[in-house]
Each structure stands twice: as structure tokens, then as C-alpha cells.
């Protein structure tokens, strides 16, 4: 057997297995197709929990600790978080539309806007973000694992470190990190849309654990401490105004990856109301409440123990090391269990499954969500996440500023959805190489240019954030502070303007039939589509399995006499006009349609 034959055989072996009515190809696998209507089960609490799990977390508990660094008081910082939440809600809900309109995820939404090949830009960025965030969250999850193990054994609590001093972690931390990874890996055996109950229960458990901690500390300290009143704003005038802008932008930037791929989870929604109400409540209530818990925790610890503990794990470590009582051990165990569940839920939904969905979009023939998630889990070790927390690494600073890169992507997607395509997309064409979304050589250069224009001005600000001594330019720094606002507007209007100046042909507004069973009969008819239940088996196979492929835009079962639209551009260059010529029994009928770019 030749080397080429061996490679081909190995590649065939690596192809993902598929069931009936499913196929894999260069552009398609079952995980990329629209979600079946039967699996769109996420109601209010599921959507609330998806965003709530980000807030009922150790990271959000610690978030207010960044306040003093920019010169704001803690109450002012909570105010910036609330404004940042409103901004996040607007961006997130606007970016939810491809998911709840057409039941597709981030990968297909990228193809709609950036093109079949151009979509790789945003997808790769999201994958890198997911992998790094996976490592970071897994490390914190490992610390939560150690809370449980510490409560079990006094010897484990004082386990000696056997690692070299050159490694920025201890033996205990390594053990917790490994255990967390192993536990998380088993969860990828489930489908993403089955995870909603885990998300809900993790939010409930973590909320009551955090509430119990705050009540206990406040009772012991006879109040909430003095941090809310003793810390004063050191910034004044325009400096204070820009500090507000920075914290708002920072707060949005920390969750911008989730806003970017919101379609991955909005497609699971049972109704638009459930998505909107759940997302709004989750991005307003816990994101405000949990940072307040964190301030109370640090304030009461300062009064009780003479030190501000911002990480819940540090609080329990103090309790266990000073008094290894049954009460302290029980508290560490149950709170540690809820924190582990919270970190697992967040890591799986926002990092593991997210990267799995994205990798499935890059290599759909060989990668499904499960394989992609496991790959991200393995590669996350290469990020050396222990250096993020146990050394002087500036990587977390850079990561918190990554909204500079993500916000322009969100902006272009929103502009295309509302102003250019008017919320109309053809799902079948997202699986065709030279179809509706091929644009220019597979790339929508207008979207790429708009993304670059919105991203580039903020890059010097990231360099300044890493090292303030690089340069001293107030304009660049202030632009970076407000990047979430400025980059969004720049990319939005640049893309809109380019589409007006250089319009592309919108030849297919949406599919005429629900080939994937993504809608109920009533929903399909409202969208002007033939319901799935009324489509023949042969036609479904033609579209979902790729049998009978006949043209660059449509599928047809072989030997069928059904009408096949052949799309022919008209002479107009300034509008998106096209002529649809229907062929049936060698007879032609013509019709003309015109769609403007904006």
C-alpha cells in the first residue's frame, strides 16, 4: 500500500461517525446544522443560568478588587458594572438573532457575514480565547477542588510541596488541576442543549453558598465592614470620567467572547421571550449582587483577620488552618462542592463546548463538538495557567482587554444582520462553497476591512496596559478606555458604508423550505417556508445528505422535474438586482427582484 493510500485510509478512519439523514464534508457535519425544533427546550431559567453561571463564580466575586487601581471607590465601581451590564445586554441580544431566528450557531453566522473562507478569522480568534479561558478557569476550578480535599484531610491541607521552586505552582495545586480536568472531560459525552439543568443547579448552589458566607462573615464582624465607606475616589474631573468609561468597557470586554458566540446558545431557546428575559435578568441581577458580596467578604475579613481576602478559597483556607473544626470542614466541603460545580459549568459551556463548536466549523469532516472540546481541554495545559495567578504574568491583563478584538466582530455581525440582510439568511447556502456566501474568493472583504478598522486603534492601548512606560499619550489611552464604544461604532459604520459603496448581490434571501426540521409548522409558515413535515423524503436527503447536487446554489434529487432556480445577474451594478430564471420541462419563466444593500 502506497503512502498516499495509507494517509487517505487514516483520514477516512478519523472522519466523525454520522447517523441517518446526516453527512460530513468540507463544510458540513451534524453539529453545524440548525437545531431540531424538538431540542429547542431552553426556557427562562435555562437562559438565565447560561449567563448567570458567569456571575455566580469566583471571578465575579473578586471583580471589584480592581476598583482602587483606577481611582474609583467601590460603590462607584458597582455603578460602572451596572452600566457595563446594560451595554452587554444590548450587544448580546442584538447578536442573538441568527440563533433564535434561524437556529444556527456562531460558525454559520460567521459564514453569513465574513464568507465561507473569511469566517475562519473570527472562528480562530474565538478558539484561541476559549482555550486560554479554559486553562484559566480550570486552574481556579482546581483550587476549588482543593477546598473539598482540604476538608477531608488535615494532612492534605498541609501537604508539602514537592515541585521545584522554579515552577509557579505547588503539588496540591497540580493535583486539584488534574482532578478538575478529568471530571470536566466526562461531561463532554452529553449534548450542549442537555446541559441546562446542570447550569441551573450550579447557579442555585453557588448563590446560597456565597450568601451563607456573607451572612456568616457579617454576623461575626457585626456589620459589613468599612470598605464601602472608607474607600474614596482618588480620581477627579476628566480623569474620573475616563475611569468610569474604562471600567464599563473593561466589564463588557471580560464577557465579550460570550456575547460574540451568543448564537451558539440562543438557538436552544424555546421562545424569544425566554431568551430576552433570561439574558436581561442574568446580566443585571447576579452581576451586580456578587461583586457586592465580594466587597463585603473582603471588608469583613479585613476587620476580623486583619487582611482583605478577595478569593473565597483564601477565606476557607484561613478558617481551616486556624481552626480545623467540624463546622469549618463542613463549610469548606459544601461551598467547595458548589464552587467546583460552578467552575465546571462555566468552563464546559463557555470554553469547552464553545471551542468544540468553533473547531467543528474549521474541520467539520474530522471534528465534532465532543472532539473539539477535548482538544481544547488538552491544549489548555500549554497556556501554563498557573503563571496567570502565581507570578507577575501580565497575560490576564491582556486577556481582559481582548474586547478590542471581539467587539468589532460583534459590530459587523449586528450591522449585517439588521441593515444589510434584514435578518434573512439561507441556511443551505452556508454549506455550499460557491453559493450565496462565497463573496470574493470566499471572503467578504468589506467585513474584514471593517473589523481591522475597528480593532487597530485599540492595539496600542493593550501595549500600554501591559507596560505604562511604553509611551505617554493621553489620546491613545483614552481611546483604549472607551474601546468598546469606539470600536463598535467604527466597525459598524465602516461596514455599512462599504456595503453601500460596493454592494454585493443578495441572490437568495432565505430557504423556501425547512429542510432541517428547525421550526414547527406554524413557525415555518410565518417565515414563508414549507414546513419540514410537508417535504418529501427525497428532497430532504438531497439537501441534508448532499445527494443530487446540481448547481452552485441549489440541490435537486437526481431525475427530478422540480423547478430549479438558476440565478443570473442583471446589468445593474449599483443595486442588488438579479433575475431568477425557472426551468421546468424546458420552459422558462422570468421574474426580477431587487434588494438594496441597506
Swiss-Prot record:
The keyword Phosphoprotein applies. Residues 574-598 are annotated as: Disordered. Pfam families: Transp_cyt_pur. GO terms for molecular function: 5-amino-1-ribofuranosylimidazole-4-carboxamide transmembrane transporter activity; nucleobase transmembrane transporter activity; thiamine transmembrane transporter activity. Gene3D superfamilies: Hydantoin permease. It is found in: Membrane. Signal peptide: none annotated. Residues 63-73, 133-173, 219-240, 296-332, 393-394, 468-483 are extracellular. The chain crosses the membrane at residues 42-62, 74-94, 112-132, 174-194, 198-218, 241-261, 275-295, 333-353, 372-392, 395-415, 447-467, 484-504. GO terms for cellular component: cell periphery; plasma membrane. One of its GO terms (biological process) is thiamine transport. The keyword Nuclease does not apply. InterPro entries: NCS1 (IPR012681), Pur-cyt_permease (IPR001248), Uracil/uridine/allantoin_perm (IPR045225). Residues 588-598 have a biased composition (Polar residues). It is a multi-pass membrane protein. Keywords: Membrane, Phosphoprotein, Transmembrane, Transmembrane helix, Transport. Present with 3120 molecules/cell in log phase SD medium. This is Thiamine transporter. It comes from Saccharomyces cerevisiae (strain ATCC 204508 / S288c) (Baker's yeast).
Amino acid at each position: 500500500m502506497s503512502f498516499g493510500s495509507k494517509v487517505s485510509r487514516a483520514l477516512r478512519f478519523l472522519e466523525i461517525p454520522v447517523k441517518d439523514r446526516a453527512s460530513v464534508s468540507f463544510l458540513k457535519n451534524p453539529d453545524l446544522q440548525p437545531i431540531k425544533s424538538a431540542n429547542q427546550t431552553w426556557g427562562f431559567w435555562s437562559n438565565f443560568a447560561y449567563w448567570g453561571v458567569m456571575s455566580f463564580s469566583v471571578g465575579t466575586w473578586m471583580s471589584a478588587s480592581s476598583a482602587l487601581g483606577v481611582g474609583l471607590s467601590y460603590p462607584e465601581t458597582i455603578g460602572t458594572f451596572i452600566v457595563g451590564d446594560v451595554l452587554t445586554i444590548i450587544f448580546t441580544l442584538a447578536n442573538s438573532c441568527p440563533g433564535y431566528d434561524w437556529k444556527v450557531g456562531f460558525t454559520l453566522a460567521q459564514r453569513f457575514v465574513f464568507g465561507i473562507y473569511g469566517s475562519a478569522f473570527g472562528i480562530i480568534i474565538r478558539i484561541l480565547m476559549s482555550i486560554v479561558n479554559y486553562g484559566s478557569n480550570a486552574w481556579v476550578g482546581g483550587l476549588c477542588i482543593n477546598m473539598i480535599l482540604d476538608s477531608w484531610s488535615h494532612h492534605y491541607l498541609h501537604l508539602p510541596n514537592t515541585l521545584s521552586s522554579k515552577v509557579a505552582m505547588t503539588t496540591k495545586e497540580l493535583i486539584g488541576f488534574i482532578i478538575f480536568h478529568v471530571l470536566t472531560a466526562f461531561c463532554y459525552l452529553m449534548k450542549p442543549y442537555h446541559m441546562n439543568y446542570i447550569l441551573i443547579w450550579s447557579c442555585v448552589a453557588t448563590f446560597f453558598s456565597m450568601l451563607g458566607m456573607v451572612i456568616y462573615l457579617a454576623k461575626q464582624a457585626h456589620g459589613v465592614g468599612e470598605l464601602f465607606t472608607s474607600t474614596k475616589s482618588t480620581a477627579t474631573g476628566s480623569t474620573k470620567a475616563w475611569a468610569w468609561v474604562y471600567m464599563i468597557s473593561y466589564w463588557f470586554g471580560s464577557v465579550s467572547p460570550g456575547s460574540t458566540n451568543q448564537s451558539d446558545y440562543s438557538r436552544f431557546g424555546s421562545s424569544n421571550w425566554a431568551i430576552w428575559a433570561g439574558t436581561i435578568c442574568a446580566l443585571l441581577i447576579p452581576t451586580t449582587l456578587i461583586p457586592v458580596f465580594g466587597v463585603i467578604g473582603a471588608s469583613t475579613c479585613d476587620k476580623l483577620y486583619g487582611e482583605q481576602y478577595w478569593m473565597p478559597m483564601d477565606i476557607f483556607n484561613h478558617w481551616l488552618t486556624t481552626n480545623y473544626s467540624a463546622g469549618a470542614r463542613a463549610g469548606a466541603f459544601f461551598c467547595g462542592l458548589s464552587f467546583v460545580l460552578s467552575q465546571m459549568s462555566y468552563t464546559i459551556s463557555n470554553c469547552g463546548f464553545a471551542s468544540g463548536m468553533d473547531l467543528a466549523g474549521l474541520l467539520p469532516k474530522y471534528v465534532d463538538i465532543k472532539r473539539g472540546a477535548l482538544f481544547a481541554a488538552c491544549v489548555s495545559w500549554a497556556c501554563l495557567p498557573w503563571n496567570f495567578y502565581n507570578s507577575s504574568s501580565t497575560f490576564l491583563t491582556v486577556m481582559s482587554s481582548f474586547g478590542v478584538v471581539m467587539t468589532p466582530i460583534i459590530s459587523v455581525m449586528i450591522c449585517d444582520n439588521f441593515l444589510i440582510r434584514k435578518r434573512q439568511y439561507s441556511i443551505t447556502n452556508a454549506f455550499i462553497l460557491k453559493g450565496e456566501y462565497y463573496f470574493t474568493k470566499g471572503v467578504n472583504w468589506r467585513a474584514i476591512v471593517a473589523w481591522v478598522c475597528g480593532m487597530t486603534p485599540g492595539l496600542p492601548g493593550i501595549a500600554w496596559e501591559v507596560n505604562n512606560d511604553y509611551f505617554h499619550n493621553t489620546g491613545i489611552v483614552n481611546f483604549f478606555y472607551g474601546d468598546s464604544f469606539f470600536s463598535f461604532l467604527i466597525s459598524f459604520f465602516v461596514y455599512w458604508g462599504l456595503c453601500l459603496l460596493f454592494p454585493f448581490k443578495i441572490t437568495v434571501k432565505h430557504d423556501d423550505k425547512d429542510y432541517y426540521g428547525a421550526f414547527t409548522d406554524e413557525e415555518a409558515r410565518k417565515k414563508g417556508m414549507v414546513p419540514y413535515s410537508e417535504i418529501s423524503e427525497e428532497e430532504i436527503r438531497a439537501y441534508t445528505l448532499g445527494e443530487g447536487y446540481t448547481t452552485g446554489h441549489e440541490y435537486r434529487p437526481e431525475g427530478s422535474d422540480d423547478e430549479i432556480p438558476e440565478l443570473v445577474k442583471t446589468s445593474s451594478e449599483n443595486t442588488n438586482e438579479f433575475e431568477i430564471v425557472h426551468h421546468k420541462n424546458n420552459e422558462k419563466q422570468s421574474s426580477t427582484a431587487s434588494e438594496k444593500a441597506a
